[in-house]
Amino acid sequence: MERPWGAADGLSRWPHGLGLLLLLQLLPPSTLSQDRLDAPPPPAAPLPRWSGPIGVSWGLRAAAAGGAFPRGGRWRRSAPGEDEECGRVRDFVAKLANNTHQHVFDDLRGSVSLSWVGDSTGVILVLTTFHVPLVIMTFGQSKLYRSEDYGKNFKDITDLINNTFIRTEFGMAIGPENSGKVVLTAEVSGGSRGGRIFRSSDFAKNFVQTDLPFHPLTQMMYSPQNSDYLLALSTENGLWVSKNFGGKWEEIHKAVCLAKWGSDNTIFFTTYANGSCKADLGALELWRTSDLGKSFKTIGVKIYSFGLGGRFLFASVMADKDTTRRIHVSTDQGDTWSMAQLPSVGQEQFYSILAANDDMVFMHVDEPGDTGFGTIFTSDDRGIVYSKSLDRHLYTTTGGETDFTNVTSLRGVYITSVLSEDNSIQTMITFDQGGRWTHLRKPENSECDATAKNKNECSLHIHASYSISQKLNVPMAPLSEPNAVGIVIAHGSVGDAISVMVPDVYISDDGGYSWTKMLEGPHYYTILDSGGIIVAIEHSSRPINVIKFSTDEGQCWQTYTFTRDPIYFTGLASEPGARSMNISIWGFTESFLTSQWVSYTIDFKDILERNCEEKDYTIWLAHSTDPEDYEDGCILGYKEQFLRLRKSSVCQNGRDYVVTKQPSICLCSLEDFLCDFGYYRPENDSKCVEQPELKGHDLEFCLYGREEHLTTNGYRKIPGDKCQGGVNPVREVKDLKKKCTSNFLSPEKQNSKSNSVPIILAIVGLMLVTVVAGVLIVKKYVCGGRFLVHRYSVLQQHAEANGVDGVDALDTASHTNKSGYHDDSDEDLLE
């Protein structure tokens, strides 16, 4: 079973450029296929995906009465009697009415997929699909629509794809950046020799039909460096490459399980030798080509899975003598490997890369057994030495759900959930990239719920992916945007743990340090104009016709009735990046026998009439908790002052808005250091103390083929930390001048064959002469002759006894490959 990428979805990647994909389901499962395609997140700044109700029942329902159109209202989220300040957005009803655009789609289709083509182009593609599985065959029909004004108007361009049925499981493959490229994968008859695609390189103004020499298994993968280069896997496990945007294809290798683009148009892939990907799992070979298939190099064997994150290449490798796996890391595209200092995992465990950038890696290591939790480790800047960051991290094995979230609106901030000893779920937050985790502060305008033992002391707990997977009344995951500094919006409950009661919506304007209840009950929400506007729609099973918006980061709210005839709401869509002023509301209307898709696009440009000026911004110190402290705001070695829009200013940031910040370096303190391997921080203490089980044990590890010895008093600098001077704990890595090998078997060693008998005899003679000296050296430097692997295994046993357990969950299938070969719920999630 393929497990999705962790909610870290945090420092993750989206090689296909901008494109938010919505799949809106209309008919029940008995009538329609339930295919759903979720677009993967973009690099380093994951964008939220709409997650709305699916399988809406078909039948006769009375629409709620609409009132006069249009109309509006306002209220303040704080105490009663303060509503006067909310009247500053004047004449907003008339302004929005003049900028509300309705489009009725003249056909009934089972699902709708929506994607943006390019950044700030205004081009949107909408694919409607009607899919009915019959006894002998499947009947399907598609329509394609295009808008070039952010969804205000649509044109039917189905004729450009020859009225062909498009396979929704492959989605719309959008090219990176502003390449304007689009690839649609068509359905073909069962007896066809290959698949069919439709290609556009002019933002979907025109399409070219191309018949493929293979049947695709995955969505076409664009090279991040050159959008003309495409990669695809076939249903027969062939690896195909196109150098001219899909015009011609060449099979460069057979028996391929997984393939990924690396940097500089490099391709990494795993291949099998004994029949199938599943049969050879754990015995796969990892190959690399840097010239699009002209030449190859085997860079790893005994591979279980591999993945890419930041500048790191990861491989989950089977051990020599048992069925355990270990993570190996390379920073030179597989030329040399080092074993990560992480616990090995067994067949029922997994590793998962939660987040990775060029500085560090967050790695989840699964606990043995189906516990549903594991341990988060954070790496050094080489991805080799890891420190324990968080125990009992929630990561289910059944559905692969984790709440790990990168708060992109403030550096160093991550939110996730832990499974406590009493099996309740609690939210934790870190502001220093995993150095220390704490509970979220209780919102000032909220009371503790029934889960709280002390009604005066409790915390805010955030609903994320796990709550959504459990079908709680949570329509959206937490939302933050890099250009809306400090803003975080999320559903939550206030108590001792996450509650199953109906959640409310909370907002933080300082990156998660403090929170305020923003809206009663569950809502859909989105950010426009870099935080200048927040839009929300109530989550309801009844038809709706009202939206809410705020121009002061959720303090005051206005309501606007966008239609007199309520619609069954299915999705709220805005252009990725939060720079747009447009929002699209998707839904359908129902009568006795008919139903129609409808969209309403609202442009807020006239609400924010003027451009923001210097006076509209104020200086804000990020991570500020104690203004009296000289080091206030120091996180990861430096402070940052931002120019932020005043809440009282009603003006446009604009599409060209750039976040203005001023960094300043801080003196080093213990807060700038993680606990080294074998050390931990007691609760509410900044000092690292040695784990009792590891006292007296040396740490030696194999780095780039040489054995090294680590001397430490318990601290290592957080990767990316920029502090200077101040505290400087001793940490030394000493080269033992000894060659070493890890359990990652060198392919050259396995495959090498000698043709020269004299050379062999000479080498043997030399070895006999030097063997005594070698034994003496080993005894002198390796404590009585214990080899590195044994030495590490001893530390491993102590670490596991102390609860430092690991998993190898490297993602072995891309998010677009929902029909991959893996059905193992314990596969490694390396991306």
Curated annotation (Swiss-Prot):
Tissue expression notes: Expressed in brain and prostate (at protein level). Expressed at high levels in brain, spinal cord, heart, skeletal muscle, thyroid, placenta and testis. Expressed at lower levels in lymphoid organs, kidney, colon and liver.
Stretches for region Intrachain binding of the propeptide and the extracellular domain: 50-61
Residues bearing glycans: 98, 162, 274, 406, 582, 684
Topological region Cytoplasmic: 779-831
Repeat region (BNR), residues: 145-156, 198-209, 240-251, 287-298, 328-339, 377-388, 428-439, 506-517, 548-559
Residues bearing the modification Phosphoserine: 814, 819, 825
Superkingdom assignment: Eukaryota
Residues carrying lipid (S-palmitoyl cysteine): 783
Subcellular location: Golgi apparatus, Golgi stack membrane; Endosome membrane; Endoplasmic reticulum membrane; Nucleus membrane
TM ranges: 756-778
Keyword Transit peptide attributed: no
Pfam families membership: Sortilin-Vps10, Sortilin_C
Keywords: Cell membrane, Cleavage on pair of basic residues, Developmental protein, Differentiation, Disulfide bond, Endocytosis, Endoplasmic reticulum, Endosome, Glycoprotein, Golgi apparatus, Lipoprotein, Lysosome, Membrane, Nucleus, Osteogenesis, Palmitate, Phosphoprotein, Receptor, Repeat, Signal, Transmembrane, Transmembrane helix, Transport
Extracellular topological domain: 78-755
InterPro entries per record: Sortilin_C, Sortilin_N, VPS10, VPS10-sortilin, WD40/YVTN_repeat-like_dom_sf
Family stated for the protein in its record: Belongs to the VPS10-related sortilin family. SORT1 subfamily.
Function of the molecule: Functions as a sorting receptor in the Golgi compartment and as a clearance receptor on the cell surface. Required for protein transport from the Golgi apparatus to the lysosomes by a pathway that is independent of the mannose-6-phosphate receptor (M6PR). Lysosomal proteins bind specifically to the receptor in the Golgi apparatus and the resulting receptor-ligand complex is transported to an acidic prelysosomal compartment where the low pH mediates the dissociation of the complex.
Name of the molecule in the record: Sortilin
Source organism: Homo sapiens (Human)
Gene behind this protein: SORT1
